[in-house]
C-alpha cells in the first residue's frame, strides 16, 4: 500500500543538466552528501544505454542505494527530459511512492549539448553545468542551457591554467549571456562553489518554509 505524504509542501524537483564530462554526477554526489542530513533526498539518473551514473552515485555513498534510480533512455538524452519526459515522470512517481516525504528529487540528465532544457512538468529548478576544460568560449556560445537555466555552474575552474582558458572572460561572457540570472564558478569536486549552489536551491526552492 502506498504511503501518504505528511509534509505540507510538495517535493522540490531539481534538474541537473550539461554536456558529457562537465561534472553533473560529481555535483549531484556532493549535493547529496552535503544535504542528506538536513533533507529527505532521492535521485534519478539518466543514461542512454547503461545505468552507470546510478552505479557511480551508489558506490560513492551519496545516498542509500534504494534512494537512487537509474533510467535508461535508449535515445537522445534531451528527449527524455523535454519532448517526452514520460519515462522520467514515471520514475519520479515511483520514487515518491517509496519515499512520500522526500524534500528534494534530483534528476540528472544524460550528457547533452547546449540546447538541452528540462520540461517544466519534470523540473521546478534547473541547474546547468559546463566545465572550463571545454574552453572559455562555451558561455558565449549560448543555447538554452546557458541562457535559460535557473543556475549556471561553471565547473573545474582549477583547470583554467592548463587549458589556456581565462576565467575573467568566462565570467564576463556568462554575465552578458545570462543577464540577471545567477551563475557559480568553482570546482565542485573540491567543494569550491558548492555552498553557493546549496544556498540557491534552498532559497529558490523555499526549502524549510
From Swiss-Prot:
<keyword id="KW-0143">Chaperone</keyword>
<dbReference type="GO" id="GO:0043419">
    <property type="term" value="P:urea catabolic process"/>
</dbReference>
<keyword id="KW-0547">Nucleotide-binding</keyword>
<dbReference type="InterPro" id="IPR003495">
    <property type="entry name" value="CobW/HypB/UreG_nucleotide-bd"/>
</dbReference>
<feature type="binding site">
    <location>
        <begin position="18"/>
        <end position="25"/>
    </location>
    <ligand>
        <name>GTP</name>
    </ligand>
</feature>
<comment type="similarity">
    <text>Belongs to the SIMIBI class G3E GTPase family. UreG subfamily.</text>
</comment>
<dbReference type="GO" id="GO:0016151">
    <property type="term" value="F:nickel cation binding"/>
</dbReference>
<keyword id="KW-0996">Nickel insertion</keyword>
<dbReference type="InterPro" id="IPR004400">
    <property type="entry name" value="UreG"/>
</dbReference>
<dbReference type="GO" id="GO:0005525">
    <property type="term" value="F:GTP binding"/>
</dbReference>
<dbReference type="GO" id="GO:0005737">
    <property type="term" value="C:cytoplasm"/>
</dbReference>
<comment type="subunit">
    <text>Homodimer. UreD, UreF and UreG form a complex that acts as a GTP-hydrolysis-dependent molecular chaperone, activating the urease apoprotein by helping to assemble the nickel containing metallocenter of UreC. The UreE protein probably delivers the nickel.</text>
</comment>
<keyword id="KW-0342">GTP-binding</keyword>
<dbReference type="InterPro" id="IPR027417">
    <property type="entry name" value="P-loop_NTPase"/>
</dbReference>
<dbReference type="GO" id="GO:0003924">
    <property type="term" value="F:GTPase activity"/>
</dbReference>
<protein>
    <recommendedName>
        <fullName>Urease accessory protein UreG</fullName>
    </recommendedName>
</protein>
<keyword id="KW-0963">Cytoplasm</keyword>
<comment type="function">
    <text>Facilitates the functional incorporation of the urease nickel metallocenter. This process requires GTP hydrolysis, probably effectuated by UreG.</text>
</comment>
<dbReference type="Pfam" id="PF02492">
    <property type="entry name" value="cobW"/>
</dbReference>
Amino acid at each position: 500500500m502506498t504511503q501518504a505524504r505528511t509534509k505540507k509542501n510538495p517535493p522540490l524537483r531539481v534538474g541537473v543538466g550539461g554536456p558529457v564530462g562537465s561534472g553533473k554526477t560529481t555535483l549531484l554526489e556532493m549535493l547529496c552528501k552535503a544535504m542528506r542530513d538536513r533533507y529527505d533526498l532521492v535521485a534519478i539518473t539518466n543514461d542512454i544505454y547503461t545505468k552507470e551514473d546510478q552505479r557511480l552515485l551508489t558506490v560513492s555513498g551519496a545516498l542509500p542505494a534504494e534512494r537512487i534510480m537509474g533510467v535508461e533512455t535508449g535515445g537522445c538524452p534531451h528527449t527524455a527530459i523535454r519532448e517526452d519526459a514520460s519515462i522520467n515522470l514515471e520514475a519520479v512517481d515511483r520514487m515518491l511512492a517509496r519515499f512520500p516525504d522526500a524534500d528534494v528529487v534530483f534528476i540528472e540528465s544524460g550528457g547533452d549539448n547546449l540546447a538541452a532544457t528540462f520540461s517544466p512538468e519534470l523540473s521546478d529548478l534547473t541547474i546547468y553545468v559546463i566545465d572550463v576544460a571545454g574552453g572559455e568560449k562555451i558561455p558565449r556560445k549560448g543555447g538554452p542551457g546557458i541562457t535559460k537555466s535557473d543556475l549556471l555552474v561553471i565547473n573545474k575552474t582549477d583547470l583554467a591554467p592548463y587549458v589556456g582558458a581565462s576565467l575573467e572572460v568566462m565570467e564576463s561572457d556568462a554575465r552578458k549571456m545570462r543577464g540577471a540570472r545567477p551563475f557559480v564558478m568553482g570546482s565542485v569536486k573540491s567543494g569550491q562553489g558548492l555552498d553557493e549552489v546549496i544556498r540557491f536551491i534552498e532559497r529558490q526552492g523555499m526549502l524549510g518554509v
